[in-house]
C-alpha cells in the first residue's frame, strides 16, 4: 500500500488540473470535451492497469503507474484546450481572492461530509464485521447514485450561473424549480428501480450470509432517500451556480451537527446498528432538504452580476 501511494502521489497535481479544467468547461456550458478527456484518460488506465500488473509483473505498483499516466493524459488535454483559447495566463488577484473565499467554504463543507461518513464507517465497524460489510455495500451504491444525480447539479450550476451573470434573475429562479422537479422525478425513478432489485442486487456484491442479513437494515433507507437526494443535489447545483457557497457550508455543518453525527454516536452507545446509522443519514438529508428549499424560496441567493 505504501509503495502504491508513493507512486500515485505523482498524479495529484494532474488530478487538480483535471478538476479545474472540468470546472472551467462546465462553467461555460461545455460538457462534451471534458467527458471525452476524462474517458480517454480512464480508458487508457483500464488498458494499462492489467498489462502492467500481470504481464509486466509490476503488481500493485503497476496499477499506480497506470493511474498516473491516465491523469497526465487528461490534464495535458485540458492544458492544450486552455492554450488554444489564446487567453492571458497572468493571475488576476481579485479573482483569486474570490475563488479562495469560495474554495474555503466548499472545503469546510467537504470536511463536514467526510467527518460524517468516516464516523458512520467507524460505528459500523464497531458493531460487527457483517454490519460494516453491509454498510459498505449500500454506501457504495449510494455514492454511485449520488454521482448519477449530480449530473443535474452540474447542469444547474452552468445554467443558473450563466443566467445570473447575464442579469436574468427571473430565468435563474424559474430554472431552479424546474431542475428541482427533474431531480424529484429522477430520484423517484431510481428509488423504484432499487426497490425492485432489493432481493437480487446485494448478492452481486457478496455471498456472505451475515452481510446479506444486515443489508436490508440499510437498504430501505437508501431506497427511500433517493427522491430526497434528487431534490437536494439539484438545489445544491442551483446554489453553487449562484455562488452561494457560504450558505451551503453553514447548512451542511448544521445538518451534520444536529442530525447525522449525534445519531451515529447514539447508535454506538445504544447498539442501534445500521438502523441508527442510516437514520442519522436520513436526518442529515432531510435537514439539508429543508434548508435548501427555504433558501431557494427566498430571494437572497439569486444575486445578479458577474460576482456576488
Task: Label every PLM stretch briefly.
Residues 1-13, 44-47, 51-107, 160-225, ...:
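Short alpha-helical transmembrane segments in multi-pass integral membrane proteins
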Residues 12-20, 24, 28, 39-47, ...:
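Hydrophobic alpha-helical transmembrane bundles that constitute the permease/transmembrane domains
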Residues 15-34, 132-197, 232-243, 247:
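Small-residue-rich hydrophobic transmembrane alpha-helices
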Residues 26, 53-55, 91, 124-127, ...:
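Structural motif
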Residues 33-37, 62-66, 250-251, 279:
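Hydrophobic alpha-helical membrane segments of integral membrane proteins
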Residues 51-58, 111-144, 162, 200-209:
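Helix-terminus/linker motif at the lipid-water interface of multi-pass membrane proteins
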Residues 235-239, 243-257, 264-272, 276:
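C-terminal structured "cap/appendage" subdomains that terminate the fold
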